[in-house]
Amino acid sequence: SASKGSGGDLNNGKIRVSKQNGLSDSMLGYSTSKITNKEYEYDFNQTYKELSNQNLSIRNSGSIALDLSYIATGRLDGMWAHGVKLWDVAAGLLIAQESGALISNFKGDPKYLDADHFVCSTPKVYKSILKSVKPYFKKLG
């Protein structure tokens, strides 16, 4: 659990994100949706391809809430997701953030709650994931 400004905790003990130093040997999660958004285009396959060419593991648990909890407890080093609904991710994002994760939308804007996409990870993995997502995300209009 977590409350803003108080950190994350599990079974009365403080939790923190992993101390992973970079993408190499990290474990990432993802969530994707076939729902189209009229405000942007995003090529998930290109991001996946770029990241999978690194020395890391990528998985999809099928549960964004579980993945965010795993980031908060150091079991997963980061994730990227698009096509999400705020009510599905808000609590998990707060727990991850309070446990030391960095979070933004795909453009790097920390106002991720206004978007249906985000990157969430340990501080030293964050920029690498964002760098792999950004080129394939394009605002329309």
Predicted regions and their residues:
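Acidic beta-strand-loop-alpha-helix segment within the catalytic core
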Residues: 1-68, 116-141
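Hydrophobic residues within well-ordered alpha-helices
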Residues: 69-72, 90-98
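Alpha-to-beta junction loops
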Residues: 73-78, 101-102
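Short, hinge-like loop/turn segments at secondary-structure boundaries
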Residues: 78, 97, 122-123
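Short beta-strand and adjacent tight-turn residues that come in two discontinuous sequence segments
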Residues: 81
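Acidic donor-binding loop at a coil-to-helix junction in glycosyltransferase catalytic cores
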Residues: 86-87
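Short, structured beta-strand-loop surface elements
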Residues: 105
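AMP-binding (ANL) adenylation modules
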Residues: 108-112
